[in-house]
Amino acid sequence: MYLLHVNVEESISYRDFFKRDNAMTNSEVSCAIGKSFSKDLLLTKEDIIEQAAFCGDENFIHHDEDRSLNTRFGGVIASGSAISSIYSAMIPTYFSKIANILGLEMSFQFKAPIYPDIRYSMSWMIESVAGDLNGTGKIVCLTGTIRDSEQKTQVMAQAKIMLLSTL
């Protein structure tokens, strides 16, 4: 079961998280420079194996427990494809409460692996905003990080989106 921890007291399944409407109210959503939003991530070994299979990543390091034990990682690690999917989905989930959104660019740097049964914090911060929502659209640039509980950066990311009044 994929778990996204919205806060310490509450855990919900990955699939249910993105169906929820109450993760953040419209009044809490902002496109101000410096605004950030975050979620906690905790994946089990079974989650990692299932997600790698679901996204078509057949690298043994994501599903073969025996072979992965003999690697520098010492066990199964999450697929970059799967992590980037979960992580990037935070952006439309956040912004779609206030405007229509189109993704324009996204890049990831995987600094360290995502291991099972460790809690990670995924966050995005708005770096710049340009344009007009009712005109050609607002271009929003974001930077993001995924960090472990010791604040070690596992993943760094950049994204550029467009917010529009209508699609």
Locations of regions flagged by a protein language model:
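HotDog/MaoC-like acyl-thioester-processing domains
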Residues: 3-36, 114-119, 123-167
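Sparse recognition of residues in long alpha-helices and their boundaries
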Residues: 67, 103, 133-134
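Hydrophobic beta-strand-centered segment that forms part of the acyl-chain substrate-binding groove
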Residues: 71-78, 85-128, 158
